[in-house]
Amino acid sequence: MIDLNFPSIFVPLVGLVFPAIAMASLSLYVQRNKIV
């Protein structure tokens, strides 16, 4: 049961949280260095 339930929580978490952190860090990097 745990093996079937864990991916159903873990996959959306990685799929949503990781891109959000990547976009946030990228926007902070651009704002600091003023590339745009």
UniProtKB/Swiss-Prot annotation:
An individual GO BP term: photosynthesis
Membrane topology summary: Single-pass membrane protein
Cysteine-cysteine disulfides: none
TM annotation in the entry: 9-29
One GO CC term on file: chloroplast thylakoid membrane
Function, as annotated: May help in the organization of the PsaL subunit.
NCBIfam families, sorted: PS_I_psaI
Family that this chain belongs to: Belongs to the PsaI family.
Name the UniProt record assigns to this protein: Photosystem I reaction center subunit VIII
Lineage, uppermost ranks: Eukaryota, Viridiplantae, Streptophyta, Embryophyta, Tracheophyta
